[in-house]
Amino acid sequence: MSQNQEISKKEQYNLNKLQKRLRRNVGEAIADFNMIEEGDRIMVCLSGGKDSYTMLEILRNLQQSAPINFSLVAVNLDQKQPGFPEHVLPEYLEKLGVEYKIVEENTYGIVKEKIPEGKTTCSLCSRLRRGILYRTATELGATKIALGHHRDDILQTLFLNMFYGGKMKGMPPKLMSDDGKHIVIRPLAYCREKDIQRFADAKAFPIIPCNLCGSQPNLQRQVIADMLRDWDKRYPGRIETMFSAMQNVVPSHLCDTNLFDFKGITHGSEVVNGGDLAFDREEIPLQPAGWQPEEDENQLDELRLNVVEVK
């Protein structure tokens, strides 16, 4: 076997392993939050970025083996930004044989008219985009709207709200729209951004730049993202621990009187499970909750070189 063939098999093995992990993450999120049900028509919002490409690919993959039947329709909103490559997504989706719709709305022109030069346009743009996508979902008869936010996005939003908004509020994996007509799901909620990036690189998706609008990036979110990346580098497993914390909320040990009846605690009240810690020293496990050792993609299991592509 030549060196090139050996490398090719190794790369394929690693890609299969990565795809299997992403499939597992997405499958668990779908099951935990009942994201997809029998007969659902899922509108997959495709921006042309790594996250939405990965979401579509994994959902298509799961569709082949899922115990329920559901359909997918990819939707892209062409906001008429200068330089937007209109041909990329139609060509890609037609090659895949995926049902799709390109919605053309000049939200770029509206935003430029309303927002002064140099100001961040993301907020208005997001509201306009949301309304158009909700309308499109109704037109297509979609029962669910799938967005490509991942685990890192959810954590960033939690810290953004804590640092700048004074709220412990993240980004829900599943929600009902304000008008009560649309269910939004985030199938990548359990997926790590670095896994998505590696998968997108390996699959060579035709990525469309996200800076075509010329808007300044959300500097506050960038600060949070840099902070989390630094923590992940210096303290392996802490990101997993923090995400696990979002799934293990104990209202009786916070300070929100809307979530727990502190005033109602009197002599004779029921005992709060785990509540008698006032004089105890905190017991923190040495190994972070939810942490798993980082897999070394350079280590090749010779016994599994001939693994077939994940179906």
Swiss-Prot record:
Anything else the record notes?
The thiolation reaction likely consists of two steps: a first activation step by ATP to form an adenylated intermediate of the target base of tRNA, and a second nucleophilic substitution step of the sulfur (S) atom supplied by the hydrosulfide attached to the Fe-S cluster.
Q: Which GO terms describe its cellular component?
A: cytoplasm
**Role of this protein:** Catalyzes the ATP-dependent 2-thiolation of cytidine in position 32 of tRNA, to form 2-thiocytidine (s(2)C32). The sulfur atoms are provided by the cysteine/cysteine desulfurase (IscS) system.
Q: Where does this protein hold [4Fe-4S] cluster?
A: 122, 125, 213
For this protein, the record's PANTHER family field holds: AMINOTRAN_5 DOMAIN-CONTAINING PROTEIN, SULFURTRANSFERASE-RELATED
Q: Which reaction does it catalyse?
A: cytidine(32) in tRNA + S-sulfanyl-L-cysteinyl-[cysteine desulfurase] + AH2 + ATP = 2-thiocytidine(32) in tRNA + L-cysteinyl-[cysteine desulfurase] + A + AMP + diphosphate + H(+)
Q: Name one Pfam family in it.
A: ATP_bind_3
Q: What quaternary arrangement does the UniProt entry report?
A: Homodimer.
Question: Where in this protein would one find the motif PP-loop motif, according to its record?
Answer: 47-52
Q: Which is a GO BP term held by this UniProt record?
A: tRNA thio-modification
Q: In which pathway does it act?
A: tRNA modification
Q: Which InterPro entries match?
A: Rossmann-like_a/b/a_fold, TilS/TtcA_N, tRNA_Cyd_32_2_STrfase, tRNA_thiolation_TtcA_Ctu1
Gene3D superfamilies cross-referenced by the UniProt entry:
HUPs (3.40.50.620)
Coiled-coil ranges per the record? Answer: none
Mention one GO molecular function.
Answer: 4 iron, 4 sulfur cluster binding
**Which family is this sequence assigned to?**
Belongs to the TtcA family.
Q: Keyword annotations for this protein?
A: 4Fe-4S, ATP-binding, Cytoplasm, Iron, Iron-sulfur, Magnesium, Metal-binding, Nucleotide-binding, RNA-binding, Transferase, tRNA processing, tRNA-binding
> What compartments host this protein?
Cytoplasm
Q: What is this protein called?
A: tRNA-cytidine(32) 2-sulfurtransferase
Broad class of the protein's primary localization: cytoplasm
Q: Does the keyword RNA-binding apply?
A: yes
Checking HAMAP family in the record gives: TtcA (MF_01850)
Q: How is the cofactor bound?
A: Binds 1 [4Fe-4S] cluster per subunit. The cluster is chelated by three Cys residues, the fourth Fe has a free coordination site that may bind a sulfur atom transferred from the persulfide of IscS.
Name any cofactors this protein relies on: Mg(2+); [4Fe-4S] cluster
The EC number of this protein is 2.8.1.-
